[in-house]
């Protein structure tokens, strides 16, 4: 029986995407071989037969033996010159242009292009409209995709039929290409429903990681001991644990990240998994769970309640998500947007967007209605930050939160998560990484045009982390309990951090400059000695990363570079090579002998060094007068007033500090000296340089040829300030 054109199964499509993920080939590379290379013999006019198609897949996917069912399904999904027959495809042909177009779109085509291609795929009579029979085929494919995604298809067909009627904007009884593209790009996630965006198919699959167990653990499948100190596999999402050899027979993962039926929306139920009771005590009866003797006890994957098997009947059906409910999006709060009622779909905020503003994919296929009075947390993790810390943090958050709240930045980037959360009220963002990762997220938020800016907290990974220090999140994560950190986040307060635009205007010169790393300052900017040290540090770390894998080593390397810089003094008499203007007025540097100037948005630099220094309150009325002036004036250069100024990352002003040399910089970095020389506090600053000088923005150094640099206020970003540390009294007790 001939197979319907276009109806490649969702499982086949998912398998194809896996092959493409690991392939390095581009369609353009393969086409060259078919046009004038060794594969030209398979081309028949503008078409290829099944044998040629198999060769195309073999080269493009870099797989010697593509499964026959997959190659046949793909071959039969394209326009053909003859009636297809599953038993004999040797005489059939497909258009090479259709094949190349399809795979080019999968490589990364625009949503509009994908929608146009799918329209032509289902418009079998090529009359430019989709009639009722063609719409029925589309609904059939959507039902197959929904079944593959484990949705409740019993209630879905009438919903899809109603949705397809809504796409017919002019009520003509058919769907034009313009209506199809408009709907798919603004209101209806057609590409997801047709199986062309398959990232929703995560549920039911364990996320295994090897784990060595320091105490007795029992296999969830065969229930025998894995062995003390032996390695097994544990699922990051549900803690289902097995022997290596038992993994293939394991039951599906119990974690469903979103509701797949209308009846599951709104109320969350407990999801119990046997074992995994790490505390060893029942949360219901408070008695011990004998976890060392057999596979016993139950734990809920959402509230993390741990109970005896016999206590299950005493625990209610409904799950409140436990102590971290303020941060968690339970599956009952996330559901396919197609399950929303018709009026809700029509009034959706996405319907007001244009195609240029939106890429309807997985993020728009799901709708989020959070539990009232909660603050859903969107977590971005850079797994490369902090050595192996980033990966471990990613695993932990995937367990304690809904995995759909947690994004691997190296794999997904931040855009998908921001699109998913764009309409979620009272949401927060947690960035797990260094200052560079935080800057990346803030820049992406800038470009995302979100209706409301969610406040951002930082879990610092690795070294440095000046911004995290200023926001009271510490200098680096050291394996603390993440649940406690999330409870601290509940007590945090919002501050609006200034961000500054940097414009570098090079002079006409034959000398070539390094690229400027950023156009925005979040932390600091500097010229001269400290940038020179940072530049040498940066080059050495890129060349020999293994020598810079601890904070102590970094400090020693920095001190060594500072010592050599003090000998060569490459930035001596800096005032002869640059002039500084603050709010249009020149800053007098003539009586100073400086080798560096730092412009600070936050008081921390180089992993905790406070270049501005502490502000101590002296006695006398003059202090109060000076402090009042310092809190209001846009430009301050008076040394007496500067002594009273306290850095504030929300005051739309910058602190300007002079550095006398590398030795002073090294002393500040190693805490042997308190601060540099306070020069000014201002809301705008301009540098004019006459020779090539080292510079840095937020720890990223570069060499800059003669230029003009303008720093102006850009905007403010809501950030979360951690709660103040609890003090201890003389006897060591918390006060």
From Swiss-Prot:
Principal subcellular localization: cytoplasm
Taxonomic path: Eukaryota, Metazoa, Chordata, Craniata, Vertebrata
Catalysed reaction equations from the record: a 1,2-diacyl-sn-glycerol + ATP = a 1,2-diacyl-sn-glycero-3-phosphate + ADP + H(+); a 1-O-alkyl-sn-glycerol + ATP = a 1-O-alkyl-sn-glycero-3-phosphate + ADP + H(+); 1-O-alkyl-2-acyl-sn-glycerol + ATP = 1-O-alkyl-2-acyl-sn-glycero-3-phosphate + ADP + H(+); 1,2-dihexadecanoyl-sn-glycerol + ATP = 1,2-dihexadecanoyl-sn-glycero-3-phosphate + ADP + H(+)
Residues bearing PTM N6-acetyllysine: 484
Xref: PANTHER family: DIACYLGLYCEROL KINASE, DIACYLGLYCEROL KINASE ALPHA
Name of protein: Diacylglycerol kinase alpha
ZnF endpoints (Phorbol-ester/DAG-type): 205-253, 269-319
E.C. code: 2.7.1.107, 2.7.1.93
InterPro entries from the UniProt entry: ATP-NAD_kinase_N, C1-like_sf, C1_DGKalpha_rpt2, DAG_kinase_typeI_N, DGK, DGK_typeI_N_sf, Diacylglycerol_kin_accessory, Diacylglycerol_kinase_cat_dom
One Pfam entry name: DAG_kinase_N
Effect of residue 134 to Q: Binds calcium but with decreased affinity
Ranges of residues in domain DAGKc: 372-506
Activity regulation summary: Stimulated by calcium and phosphatidylserine.
């Amino acid at each position: 029986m001939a197979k319907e054109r276009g109806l490649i199964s969702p499982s086949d499509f998912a398998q194809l995407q896996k092959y493409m993920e690991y392939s390095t080939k581009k369609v353009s590379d393969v086409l060259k071989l078919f046009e004038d290379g060794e594969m030209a013999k398979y081309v028949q006019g503008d078409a290829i037969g099944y044998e040629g198609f198999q060769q195309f897949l073999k080269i493009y996917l870099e797989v010697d033996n593509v499964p026959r069912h997959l190659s046949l399904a793909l071959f039969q999904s394209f326009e053909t010159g003859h009636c297809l027959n599953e038993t004999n495809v040797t005489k059939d042909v497909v258009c090479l242009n259709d094949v190349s177009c399809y795979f080019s779109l999968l490589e990364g085509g625009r949503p509009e292009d994908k929608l146009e291609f799918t329209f032509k795929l289902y418009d079998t009579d090529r009359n430019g409209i989709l009639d009722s029979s063609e719409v029925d085929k589309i609904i059939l494919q959507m039902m197959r995709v929904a079944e593959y995604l484990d949705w409740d298809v019993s209630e879905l067909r009438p919903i899809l039929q109603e949705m397809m009627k809504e796409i017919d904007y002019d009520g003509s009884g058919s769907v034009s290409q313009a209506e199809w593209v408009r709907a798919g790009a603004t209101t209806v996630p057609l590409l997801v429903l047709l199986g062309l965006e398959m990232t929703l198919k995560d549920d039911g699959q364990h996320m295994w990681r090897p784990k060595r167990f320091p105490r007795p653990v029992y296999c969830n499948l065969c229930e025998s001991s894995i062995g003390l100190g032996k390695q097994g596999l544990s699922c990051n999402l549900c803690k289902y644990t097995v022997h290596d050899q038992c993994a293939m027979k394991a039951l599906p993962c119990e974690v469903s990240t979103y509701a797949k039926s209308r009846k599951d929306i709104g109320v969350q139920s407990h999801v119990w998994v046997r074992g995994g009771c790490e505390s060893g005590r029942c949360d219901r009866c408070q008695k011990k769970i004998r976890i060392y003797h057999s596979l016993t006890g139950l734990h809920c994957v959402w509230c993390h309640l741990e109970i005896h098997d016999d206590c299950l009947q005493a625990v209610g059906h409904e799950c409140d998500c436990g102590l971290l409910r303020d941060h968690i999006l339970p599956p009952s709060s996330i559901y396919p947007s197609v399950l929303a009622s018709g009026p809700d779909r029509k009034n959706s905020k996405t319907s007001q967007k244009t195609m240029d503003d939106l890429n309807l994919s997985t993020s728009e296929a799901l709708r989020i209605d959070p539990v009232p009075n909660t603050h859903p947390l969107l977590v971005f993790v850079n797994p490369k930050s902090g050595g192996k810390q980033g990966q471990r943090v990613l695993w932990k958050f995937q367990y304690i939160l809904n995995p759909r709240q947690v994004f691997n930045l190296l794999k997904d980037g931040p855009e998908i998560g921001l699109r998913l959360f764009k309409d979620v009220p009272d949401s927060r963002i947690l960035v797990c990484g260094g200052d560079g990762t935080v800057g990346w997220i803030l820049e992406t938020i800038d470009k995302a045009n979100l209706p409301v800016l969610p406040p951002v907290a930082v879990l610092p990974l690795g070294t440095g982390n000046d911004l995290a220090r200023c926001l009271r999140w510490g200098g680096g994560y050291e394996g603390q309990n993440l649940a406690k950190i999330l409870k601290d986040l509940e007590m945090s307060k919002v501050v609006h951090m200034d961000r500054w635009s940097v414009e570098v205007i090079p002079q006409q010169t034959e000398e070539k400059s390094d690229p400027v790393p950023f156009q925005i300052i979040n932390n600091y900017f500097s010229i001269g000695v400290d940038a020179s040290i940072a530049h040498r540090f940066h080059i050495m770390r890129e060349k020999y990363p293994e020598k810079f894998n601890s904070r102590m080593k970094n400090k020693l390397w920095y001190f060594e570079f500072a010592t050599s810089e003090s000998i060569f003094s490459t930035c001596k008499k800096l005032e002869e090579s640059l002039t500084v203007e603050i709010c249009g007025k020149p800053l007098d540097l003539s009586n100073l002998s400086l080798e560096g100037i730092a412009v600070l948005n936050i008081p921390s630099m180089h992993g905790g060094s406070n270049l501005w220094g502490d502000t101590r309150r002296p006695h006398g009325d003059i202090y109060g007068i000076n402090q009042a002036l310092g809190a209001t004036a846009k430009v301050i250069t008076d040394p007496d007033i500067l002594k009273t100024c306290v850095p504030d990352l929300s005051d739309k002003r910058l602190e300007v500090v002079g550095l006398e040399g590398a030795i002073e910089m090294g002393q500040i970095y190693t805490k042997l000296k308190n601060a540099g020389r306070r020069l000014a506090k201002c809301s705008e600053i301009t540098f004019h340089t006459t020779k090539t000088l080292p510079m840095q923005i937020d720890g990223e150094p570069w060499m800059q040829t003669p230029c003009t640099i303008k720093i102006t206020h850009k905007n403010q970003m809501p950030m979360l300030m951690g709660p103040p540390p609890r003090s201890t009294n003389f006897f060591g007790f918390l006060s």
